[in-house]
């Protein structure tokens, strides 16, 4: 489910909770919630499996949409709201998973294909930003001025012979070469007035040093790109090698946030609206469950030692047999009732987005 915690006290409120017990006809998953400019006035989240779709909330109203088309790989996946326009950048991913028998990291989640989409909620229209067979693009994130879109990119043709390989073999071959799949950080320029994009540009070539980047997030002042770096792949929540890094766009330098990192997973992250705090998912306590950690980020671009999100009962999080993930910081609370969200989710398939070129 989705929950919100008031960081000024101990209050926890349920935004929406799916079924706690398995129900064949109603079982579904809630994930990938995202907010515009750190506010809940414009927000969205995905529903997977039964009653699937994307729930978009604007002007206090919720609607379900299907961001699908014959040219789109699956549907909208990882989102990022444009800061000034009524637009959302999505990746669209064909994702699967495999299980290791002897590797200490038991699950490997991988994409077999991914592209980038631009969605207009007001018009309910969607189009491609980037659509390629040789590259896998994912995790889009806008700069605060809305003129640059950052994303992660894997040059798949450097790992597989795509010229001769049939599509039906790609997933199997990626699984066999899972530790060779590595992502760099790229960007494209964007003109908000004409809504046109420039050509891809390299920002951080992580594969050149044998690493892989995921989850770029630009700081509110536009100076830093916070990202997660690991040894391979793009689902770093399962990778003990994953750490938080930043790219200082002004100084053109990259460095790890060592005081905040740990020897275990440090993965999904978000900035506070003033750029002085970061919240991220970590498995540093037991290696099994992700828990939210908070770290201060000073004006010189340095992080302080991270601490677990406090609870009134200090043992609550450690004894909870559930994982936290996808932490997001907002300046206001979600106010739409859970009953309205449930009605929106259960009441039909929703409106299909119109595909444009």
Where are these regions (language model features)?
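Sequence signature of WD/YWTD-type beta-propeller architectures
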Residues: 1-357
């Amino acid at each position: 489910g989705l929950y919100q915690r008031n960081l000024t006290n101990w209050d926890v409120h349920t935004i929406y909770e799916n079924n706690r017990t398995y129900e064949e006809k109603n079982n579904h998953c809630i994930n990938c919630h995202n907010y515009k400019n750190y506010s809940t006035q414009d927000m969205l989240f995905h529903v997977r499996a039964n009653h699937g779709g994307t729930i978009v909330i604007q002007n206090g109203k919720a609607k379900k949409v299907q961001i699908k088309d014959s040219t789109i790989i699956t549907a909208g996946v990882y989102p990022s709201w444009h800061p000034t326009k009524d637009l959302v950048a999505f990746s669209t991913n064909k994702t699967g998973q495999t299980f290791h028998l002897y590797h200490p990291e038991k699950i490997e989640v991988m994409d077999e294909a991914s592209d980038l989409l631009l969605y207009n909620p007001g018009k309910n229209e969607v189009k491609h930003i980037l659509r390629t067979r040789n590259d896998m693009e994912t995790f889009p994130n806008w700069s605060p001025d809305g003129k640059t879109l950052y994303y992660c990119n894997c040059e798949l043709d450097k790992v597989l012979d795509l010229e001769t390989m049939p599509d039906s073999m790609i997933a199997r071959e990626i699984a066999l070469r899972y530790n060779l799949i590595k992502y760099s950080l790229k960007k494209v320029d964007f003109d908000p007035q004409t809504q046109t994009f420039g050509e891809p540009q390299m920002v951080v070539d992580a594969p050149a040093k044998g690493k892989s980047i995921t989850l770029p997030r630009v700081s509110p002042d536009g100076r830093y790109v916070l990202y997660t770096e690991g040894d391979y792949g793009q689902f770093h929540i399962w990778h003990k090698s994953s750490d938080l890094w930043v790219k200082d766009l002004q100084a053109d330098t990259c460095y790890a946030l060592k005081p905040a990192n740990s020897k275990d997973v440090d993965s999904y992250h978000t900035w506070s609206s003033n750029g002085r705090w970061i919240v991220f998912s970590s498995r540093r306590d037991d290696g099994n469950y992700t828990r939210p950690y908070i770290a201060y980020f000073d004006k010189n671009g340095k992080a302080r030692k991270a601490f677990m999100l406090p609870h009134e009962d200090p043992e609550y999080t450690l004894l909870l047999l559930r994982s936290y993930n996808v932490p997001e910081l907002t300046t206001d609370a979600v106010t739409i009732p859970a009953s309205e969200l449930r009605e929106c989710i259960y009441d039909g398939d929703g409106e299909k987005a119109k595909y444009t070129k």
